[in-house]
């Protein structure tokens, strides 16, 4: 088990009062637990649980469960004024059989002989000190949870089954075998009904997890009898890790054995939630409170799968953005299916810093609805980001900067007094921006030559910028750009009005600027970009475009 220190809580009357009214989803979920114990009073310890299937490396969805559950746990601590102990158990189903060889492992053929073996008995294909596939993947999960400083207890199904921690409930499952079958059989097709058993023996001969019908279930002896793979009739005790449960009964058994009060799971489990609950109750437990979240999708709109390795990995996100941005993406709209791919990173980074800058100015009731309060467990840091991530990406694109020093040259001129030393958050973003640009923006950059109308517009813009002194504010530059566009019929938008009452400016004008000057379809406010990049530098860029040196 791995355990870390819980974040400290400073309770104030303002915080307590705001929490009682807070509408953010972690508070709504925490109130379910209060309601659960409204009649009996709260227990000494409330148990939160998340599950992990180590058939593949942990992905962001796996991390998201722990992050979101931790947010609910923190909200619960505030609502109870931290008078009730809490535990978060991260449970790995590492006794499950390997149903197929994952796509994203080295030397797949070497794992073929281990199909249907418990994941904790499959050799580790990645090298290093971990003895099994599951031990490696469990370590990868813990490593990442540790980098975030989560307070959690890691639990292994293999250890819990083999150490006897589930024995009492497993013996109860033998006693109540018929009741469990009454829940399970109606959920199965006719063919499966004939052979289904909630018990999966682990063959004493081959070590494989067996999906075989039961010949006898002996409640008194606590044993099951079945035919092993070679046809020999075999009797095993259900205790000591010789037998495990099918995954649906296993879910409910775990809740009963551990006394779980709250567990969230993906929408793919929603139809089975009633089954898990019923099994838990049959085995003498009380079903926990649930929270069902929508699944993350890859760039093609497909469900992200650990074994396929599609979508984006934890390490990949963290190569291009700070960890807090990942926590924000998990906090936002958990009941909405969202695409989880590289192109969501810049927007999420900028949203995080926008929320962070707003926090200090907010009343308590608004603070508790601000994602950064939940991400940082009520103690968000102070950070001032004078340049957005999106703007920095455009700066890298226009300047072809390969080193942080070049970018800092532009930033220091634009925001005097800001240095890498006194703004480490911004310095980190500079590194992220260069890496993100090189890996995702640069390969897709595509400049196009301007047509005659666009050439005239660019010439007019060049002349207009020439009238502005160096160091002109971004808003003034933006207005000057709009003045140029308003005079050109193609870019007049008659559904909008200019300050003078004439037509407004179509977004197609700014799209043209980005396509011709930056080689991208869109970008942040162009006036802000010019202020950061420099008026003279932007004019030089326009001249290059007009001379055909970009496209």
Swiss-Prot record:
EC number in record: 6.1.1.6
Keywords: Aminoacyl-tRNA synthetase, ATP-binding, Cytoplasm, Ligase, Nucleotide-binding, Protein biosynthesis
Keyword Cell membrane in record: no
Pfam families: tRNA-synt_1f
One GO BP: lysyl-tRNA aminoacylation
Superkingdom assignment: Bacteria
Residues annotated for ATP binding in this entry: 306
GO molecular function: ATP binding; lysine-tRNA ligase activity; tRNA binding
Compartment(s) of residence: Cytoplasm
HAMAP family found in the cross-reference section: Lys_tRNA_synth_class1
Family from the record: Belongs to the class-I aminoacyl-tRNA synthetase family.
Protein name: Lysine--tRNA ligase
Species: Brucella suis biovar 1 (strain 1330)
